[in-house]
Amino acid sequence: MLENKIVVLTGGGDGIGWECAKAYVKAGATICILDKNQLAENKLEELKTTKTLALTCNLANEAEVANAFNTIIEKYGRIDAIHNNAAIAHPSKTLDQTSNSEWDLLMDINLKSILYTTRYGIAHLKKSQGCILNTSSMVGSIGQDNHAVYVATKGAINALTKAMALDYAPFKIRVNAVSPAAINTPTLQAWSQEQPNKGEIEKYLNKLQPLGDMPAGDVIADACTFLLSNAARFITGTILPVSGGAELGYRTLI
């Protein structure tokens, strides 16, 4: 589905991002992973392809993002898709408990990184008539307690996706977002293990989706592969829920 496409993927080193990296390679793409952590060689070897470029990049630093895009263009000559996946969710706090530095960090990683990847990638997407995909979250539509700033960034991503879709449609550039619910990733597992009521949390998360237990990240990766592919060539401005129906309404979970 993604044969011969050059895909830039932020936050591709673990969790949903890593599942997307594997799916994109399987679909035929060359992937350029931008991640704050250096990817170990043995992890890249799991992809079983030479069609990868891994760059250590602080996505909140404009100069580093600019340098990363210059490196990608020097190596491949074009960009066909950008998947803005990098995000942080913690700390778990109400708004009044949030410090200025915590606010700035979440805004920088979750939102300003999209500004930077667009600023340095859009000229190349205009040439390729490519696409942009943003990773949002169900909480950006329905809210969540004790995650005020994270929720705000995901709600902003939903609105930004629609605005970008309108702005770049004249250039035949599609812009969409994928909106997961709870996904069984190492990050979520680590967080739940730290909670005093971890057993109750795990039971709740596994009941959250009407379609069944909390899925692994590959279900999100499959949806992302579709949205980046030509099969979605007439889809833009869409916030695609991949949530097993978790956002449909209140359910009795006990």
Pin down the residues of each PLM region.
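Active-site helix of classical SDR
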Residues: T118, T153, T161
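Substrate-binding pocket helix/loop in short-chain dehydrogenase/reductase
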Residues: K93-L95, S99-L105, L205
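Alpha-helical segment proximal to the catalytic Tyr-Lys
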Residues: A123, L166-P170, R233
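Short C-terminal tail/terminal secondary-structure segment
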Residues: S92, T225, T236-I254
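Conserved glycine-rich cofactor-binding loop
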Residues: G13-G15
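Residue(s) in the substrate-gating loop at a strand-loop-helix junction
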Residues: S137
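C-terminal helical subdomain
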Residues: A177, G199-A231, I235, V242-G244
